[in-house]
Amino acid sequence: MARVTAEDCNKIIPDRFRLVVLATRYAKLLNYKVETSYSKKEKRDKPPVIALRRIAAGKVSVAQLEQDLINSLCTRNIIEPLANQDDLEDVEEKFDYLPEVYVGEDYSDLDDQIFIDENGEYDERDK
C-alpha cells in the first residue's frame, strides 16, 4: 500500500492546517457520494486517503474546495424584518405571558415568588 504523506500534499497546499481542513471537506464529499468517479485503485481506499491522494496529484481544485467549504459554513437563514404593524403586534402578544421576575444579588427575592406546576395550579415552593 502506498502511503500519502503530508509532504506530497504540501507542494499543493503549503499550510498543514489548511490542508487538513480542505482534505477533510473533500473526504466528507466523497463519503456522501457527491463525487462518485473512483479509479480501480481507489475503490478499496477510504475517503480521507482518496482525498489526500487527489490533492497531492493536483486533481482537485483547491479554490473550488475552499469556496465549497465557505458556502457550507455560511448561514442560510435570513431573518426578514417585520413589514407592518399587525405583524409586530402578533409577535408582542406571543410574549405577553412572560412574567416579570426581579432577582436580587442574593436571590432572596425568589422566596416570595409563586410558581405554577405542570397542571397549571399555583405551587408555593418550600423555603
Swiss-Prot record:
Which example biological process does GO assign this protein?
A: DNA-templated transcription
Q: What EC numbers are recorded for this enzyme?
A: 2.7.7.6
The record's section on Pfam families has: RNA_pol_Rpb6 (PF01192)
Q: Which reaction does it catalyse?
A: RNA(n) + a ribonucleoside 5'-triphosphate = RNA(n+1) + diphosphate
Mention any one GO cellular component term assigned to this protein in its UniProt record: DNA-directed RNA polymerase complex
Record keywords: DNA-directed RNA polymerase, Nucleotidyltransferase, Transcription, Transferase
Which GO molecular function entries does the Swiss-Prot or TrEMBL record give?
DNA binding; DNA-directed RNA polymerase activity
User: Mind telling me which InterPro entries this protein's record contains?
Assistant: DNA-dir_RNA_pol_omega, Pol_omega/Rpo6/RPB6, RPB6/omega-like_sf
Q: What class of enzyme is it?
A: transferase
* HAMAP family reported in the protein's UniProt record: RNApol_bact_RpoZ
As for what it does, the entry says:
Promotes RNA polymerase assembly. Latches the N- and C-terminal regions of the beta' subunit thereby facilitating its interaction with the beta and alpha subunits.
What is the protein's quaternary organization?
The RNAP catalytic core consists of 2 alpha, 1 beta, 1 beta' and 1 omega subunit. When a sigma factor is associated with the core the holoenzyme is formed, which can initiate transcription.
Its family?
Answer: Belongs to the RNA polymerase subunit omega family.
Q: What is this protein called?
A: DNA-directed RNA polymerase subunit omega
